[in-house]
């Protein structure tokens, strides 16, 4: 049968689409599709992009990925893909894919910080990397090195990084880019529930009556989930309600029954308005039994700062930055804050001194009466006036929308799901606003129930599965454990077979502080893995200069030359998703594994291999002796204890951490891997010359399986249970905790969660035990020294409205919001290499209200400068596009390195979660 490529593509697409929706496929189309797929091998895998976790089928032929389609058997996406998902194959074969290590060298071929990039061998790359690491490590100790990790690590990669950096090098300066996207959600989960990650699952979409999005443009950022929302809405348009709360109109508004455009930061006030409506005007709606049996009321300090440098006159600040920087020490209360902080005895014009009482867990129990008192100012009139974000909308219209919003939550029999992503997380009070969502759902008893719950959606494919569950944050260990807790360190040392006292008890530098420490000379070696920190971090002009400081050495492991690679000193070419084994964990706690489909391109190698090879270059005697952390802490010499465990000071970290006797018991030849590549285990046909200059022939044991089986010991029996390695390769993922082979759909609900049943506290049990001992007090402060244990209960927090540190002014009159677009992923490092996606959206635009553009004398598509106190970028204006901003606000996506918008953004963070607020700063815009 002969037919054209065009005919084949049409028939294959038709067959796939028909299969996805359950239609029968015409025999001719099916025959054409099968003919075109001769010699293809299909295997299940996972999409490389967002946190939805779509299952895909990957086809290989002649050692190349030749096609990708949605997996009809995958429960998340049911055969559908979004526009990015369909191009999973093409991200791997961009024209400028990195294929060899690149080092800055002089004319003699020697490393030179001011030299140009030239290809070098893996041996040369690791020789220089080792020397530079040891220089920083020997001079500054474990605090002198840092690793930018990722929510795009595979689970095994993240676990290996945590074990190497924290267990091997005894440094906690490992922090993922998930700090930028999920840290506020994490902090709120831990403070509220005592355990991380959502209670519900995606099935809530089909089971609910109401979907309310808060700072979540799901139509573009989680399009497959939005397809499910759309299907639910259209199934019963009159009953099912969709509400979109945002600071600008976006595609999610197209389906919404109500669109609420609010002023940046005032989501804090809107949540409190809803709670006030419940408590003051509809007390009958409170689920008193749920609240009494399963919750307590709590609050915390407000003088927590804004997560900027505490040295407000830091030498590296530009003079233009100083007025905003000063708010880290104190601020004058605005008129709005004079109302919302009245319960503290403060008024507008008072000066609040920032005492930085922002440690997670620094809160206390209050009475319901105090909680009610604190909500009193958040009347409909006050909140509507404060929060109305569209000056062209009448106040009465906005008030009517807020009332309808509250009524939907309050309606007794109505099921409600609240979804949010970066709009709430990237927020200088991100932890607070996350906690407010639970406040409302708890009051109504609409949490941890099928079809009802507050649901934080993850942005990255394994921000949950790796960054959070594995513990690649600077303060965490696997399974919600933390470095500061001696019991948690003891558990980790036992599983990792480390001498007692090896692990560093002091929290490391978080993502933003790794940048600041590079600028200050406190960190002199940084390794970038699976992300692009120099493009994704606010106030970027500072960090570009820091990277090029002569004393700093930057290593970037990447597949393409993004901004971070360009400012680095050494670039390591890295295998991409289907060129390695791995696993991701998505937003509904679903863990999914895949097999390596093809060998990496050129001489690129997997991150697991890179870390393993680097670990070979360090002997125990170099890293496990006494190590000074600061003036108060010196880590003990554990070499004698290591000897007692059978280790030698001459042993390498590779031998102890990754190639020990247990690891070697995982046989190289495994039925799961039969017929598939496994570069780390066997090497591959490329015969890559490895870090020792010899052809790499593999480790001879199944390192990925070993890493998985060791890792899951941390969570089993503790509410984080995972299945064994083989099981995941037979299923389309499982939602943890996986107990007796069964996944858990709704946590904390005894009907569905075996841990909740085991607790024996009734229908619900919020069994997380972190931060569950707290004092009692009033709205001002704790009043008891004694701490009271909280068992199987969650916390209902009161958190007030406070202004962000930077707001529009006469000089910088516009709000700036940043974010993503449907067609591109994060910094565009992968998707900008896909011709179809590049042609669809070739550049980042400055979305602006037509009247704002008219005032500036700017027409559609004309170039403007977007300038803040920190920097400026040039972009073309769009007044008609997908993102329709209100007067006074502009939106610029960050995927385009030529429109380097993070030069403009403020590096303020939530002081509790340390997550950067990319959603609000002040700018001026003028014609270029």
UniProtKB/Swiss-Prot annotation:
Cofactor: [4Fe-4S] cluster; Mo-bis(molybdopterin guanine dinucleotide)
SMART domains (UniProt xref): Molybdop_Fe4S4
Its biological purpose: Catalytic subunit of the periplasmic nitrate reductase complex NapAB. Receives electrons from NapB and catalyzes the reduction of nitrate to nitrite.
First-level EC class: oxidoreductase
PTM notes: Predicted to be exported by the Tat system. The position of the signal peptide cleavage has not been experimentally proven.
One Gene Ontology MF term: 4 iron, 4 sulfur cluster binding
Protein name: Periplasmic nitrate reductase
Family matches, as Pfam families: Molybdop_Fe4S4, Molybdopterin, Molydop_binding
Binding site for Mo-bis(molybdopterin guanine dinucleotide): 84, 152, 177, 181, 214-221, 265-267, 422, 426, 532, 557-558, 580, 607, 818-827, 902, 919
Region forming the signal peptide: 1-33
Catalytic reaction(s) noted: 2 Fe(II)-[cytochrome] + nitrate + 2 H(+) = 2 Fe(III)-[cytochrome] + nitrite + H2O
Ranges of residues in domain 4Fe-4S Mo/W bis-MGD-type: 40-96
EC number: 1.9.6.1
